[in-house]
Amino acid sequence: NNYQKNAPYGLYKNDKLVSVIFATTSHATKYINLYEIVTLQGQEGKGYATDIWSQFIEHWFDAGMKRIKLSCTPSSITWHMRNGLIFWAVDKQGSLRSDQPLKRTINEQVDFREYALTEPSVALPDKKTRMKLREEDVETLQLSQKKILETYQAIQKVGEYWFRPYLYGLPNSKK
């Protein structure tokens, strides 16, 4: 991660850093690759992660980014679902992988996801990415029983926002 080129994105309250996002962006591919959202110790539960996420997506949407990808730990799934994410695969750590068009606001992201339920093609990444995501599945991972259980529970929790089946083909349009 080259943080000289991609400085962490910080949220300050009363001149104090309260939350940070670590991500890289590519102007060539118009992708944001988000690595981590951190709320500093003692600042949890005050909505700062949502504040920084909201500012972050608005900033990068306005800067011309088109898609965002990230891995979401099972313990963070509920929060990410509130922000309009969909999920395709499971990474080597058992986190759920999201890759989708970037919208300017959380509400627009949620509205987009609801539309994608009826028209999944609008959310699909490019073919090369789809092929890579197909290779990332719970069954192929060497995870502990505890991790596998947490991952399966996260997949159950995301419910209809688990878009993995669409990596293998799209249903007939529901319109």
Name these PLM-found stretches.
Residues 73, 93-174:
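C-terminal "cap" of GNAT-fold acetyltransferases
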Residues 8-10, 23, 57, 98, ...:
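Small side chains
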Residues 39, 45-58:
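Conserved acetyl-CoA-binding loop-helix of GNAT-fold acetyltransferases
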Residues 29-31, 67, 95, 112:
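A generic structural signal for beta-strand entry/edge sites
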Residues 62, 73-98:
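Conserved active-site alpha-helix within GNAT-family acetyltransferase domains
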Residues 1-38:
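A conserved beta-strand-loop-helix scaffold within acyl/acetyltransferase catalytic domains
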